[in-house]
């Protein structure tokens, strides 16, 4: 059973790490490992839902623009100015489908999600961030929406592995394909929205179970904390982005992995 303190801490962990390229799922599992707390995966999805609300608020104007474009497209009243938004909508749709397929496959191997596996993935994420920060290589495929969507969907799907940062790997793949950082972050965060809502729809029956098995108050407290902390976290992330200091996250992940290996 989860208590109030655990709910608050898990909410803080989720709120901070969701928007930072350090893997929120990896940190949640790491924390639960040390306090010997076992929770159903649907609890993590509920926390992700709380932080997705932060994304919706942060990008509310952009989402409104995309929704308006989609309505005009449905009514066949689009114009040339809608072309960019239609491409983004198409890209997010392809990414969502591919991610869903990959994520469903990976979810069948949850027994692999051991502590050493998570730590190795932390290191991989740290390396990807360094490659992103210092622009190790770049190819220009951004105009081919289908290929970009498939590639980014595959990469985002790998983010289902705890320790592999979903935002980190999608931002990395977007920049490799020729997108600038601002566009890469936008695609990464907006593509998370349908993924989380899709996961909720697929596991909607399990939501009833967690409210029956776990404490209703503690579950919602954790989600509320994740939401509030997430508001501050997303602003911190974009501030560090503007200052071009993402490599700090690589240093953190390397240090965390080494420290945990040493003491465990």
Swiss-Prot record:
It is an enzyme of class 3 (hydrolase). GO terms for biological process: cell wall organization; peptidoglycan biosynthetic process; regulation of cell shape; response to antibiotic. Keywords: Antibiotic resistance, Cell inner membrane, Cell membrane, Cell shape, Cell wall biogenesis/degradation, Hydrolase, Membrane, Peptidoglycan synthesis, Transmembrane, Transmembrane helix. The chain crosses the membrane at residues 2-22, 39-59, 86-106, 112-132, 145-165, 182-202, 210-230, 244-264. Its EC number is 3.6.1.27. Belongs to the UppP family. PANTHER family: UNDECAPRENYL-DIPHOSPHATASE (PTHR30622:SF2). Bacitracin is thought to be involved in the inhibition of peptidoglycan synthesis by sequestering undecaprenyl diphosphate, thereby reducing the pool of lipid carrier available. This is Undecaprenyl-diphosphatase. The gene is uppP.
């Amino acid at each position: 059973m989860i208590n109030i303190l655990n709910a608050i801490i898990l909410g803080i962990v989720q709120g901070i790490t969701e928007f930072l390229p350090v893997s929120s799922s990896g940190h949640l599992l790491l924390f639960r490992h040390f306090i010997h707390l076992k929770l159903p995966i649907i609890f993590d999805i509920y926390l992700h839902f709380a932080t997705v609300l932060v994304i919706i608020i942060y990008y509310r104007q952009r989402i409104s623009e995309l929704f308006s474009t989609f309505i005009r497209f449905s009514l066949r009243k689009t114009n040339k100015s809608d072309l960019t938004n239609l491409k983004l909508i198409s890209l997010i749709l392809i990414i969502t489908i591919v991610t869903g397929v990959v994520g469903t496959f990976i979810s069948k191997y949850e027994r692999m999600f051991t502590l050493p596996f998570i730590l190795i993935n932390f290191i991989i994420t740290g390396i990807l961030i360094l490659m992103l920060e210092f622009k190790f290589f770049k190819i220009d495929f951004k105009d081919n929406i289908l290929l970009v969507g498939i590639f980014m969907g595959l990469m985002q799907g790998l983010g289902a592995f705890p320790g592999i940062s979903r935002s980190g790997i999608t931002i990395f793949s977007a920049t490799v394909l020729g997108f600038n950082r601002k566009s890469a972050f936008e695609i990464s965060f907006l593509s998370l929205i349908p993924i989380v809502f899709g996961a909720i729809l697929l596991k909607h029956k399990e939501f009833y179970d967690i409210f029956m098995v776990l404490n209703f108050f503690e579950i919602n407290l954790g989600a509320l904390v994740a939401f509030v902390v997430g508001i501050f976290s997303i602003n911190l992330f974009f501030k560090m982005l503007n200052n071009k200091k993402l490599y700090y996250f690589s240093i953190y992940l390397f240090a965390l992995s080494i420290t945990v290996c040493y003491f465990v």
